[in-house]
Amino acid sequence: MGKRKKSTRKPTKRLVQKLDTKFNCLFCNHEKSVSCTLDKKNSIGTLSCKICGQSFQTRINSLSQPVDVYSDWFDAVEEVNSGRGSDTDDGDEGSDSDYESDSEQDAKTQNDGEIDSDEEEVDSDEERIGQVKRGRGALVDSDDE
């Protein structure tokens, strides 16, 4: 006798996990308080926090999702916090960075109204060369003797 034929299994539908559209605020730390809207017509993604009122806008493309706008916001906040976002170096004056040298400050205090010893030597060399060219001190005796 023959075996009973097994029925074929139907393929299972894949569950597509939707990405979040509500996020945690980076400033006030409230959960799911940041909502994201995508304006694909104008290519602008906007985030805004309902609690603290913080907002952010960035350019998007046709494939962008709300999580992309949130990640851009996260990167921008990190960039500002690390100091790379500012154009001025005002915050660097009081810090003790490994890359700063104290010799720059020493040079500034020395050059305030004082002449550097190297500059004095250059001035005396220029005067000596100028005297030779003007004929005050002849290097070679003339042939007229």
Curated annotation (Swiss-Prot):
GO terms for molecular function: RNA polymerase II complex binding; zinc ion binding. GO terms for cellular component: nucleus; transcription elongation factor complex. One of its GO terms (biological process) is transcription elongation by RNA polymerase II. SUPFAM superfamilies: Zinc beta-ribbon. Pfam families: Zn_ribbon_Elf1 (PF05129). Residues 88-104, 113-126 have a biased composition (Acidic residues). Residues 80-145 are annotated as: Disordered. Zn(2+) binds at residues 25, 28, 49, 52. Its main location: nucleus. The modification Phosphoserine is found at residues 55, 117, 124, 142. It is found in: Nucleus. Keywords: Metal-binding, Nucleus, Phosphoprotein, Transcription, Transcription regulation, Zinc, Zinc-finger. Present with 5860 molecules/cell in log phase SD medium. Transcription elongation factor implicated in the maintenance of proper chromatin structure in actively transcribed regions. Belongs to the ELOF1 family. This is Transcription elongation factor 1. It comes from Saccharomyces cerevisiae (strain ATCC 204508 / S288c) (Baker's yeast).
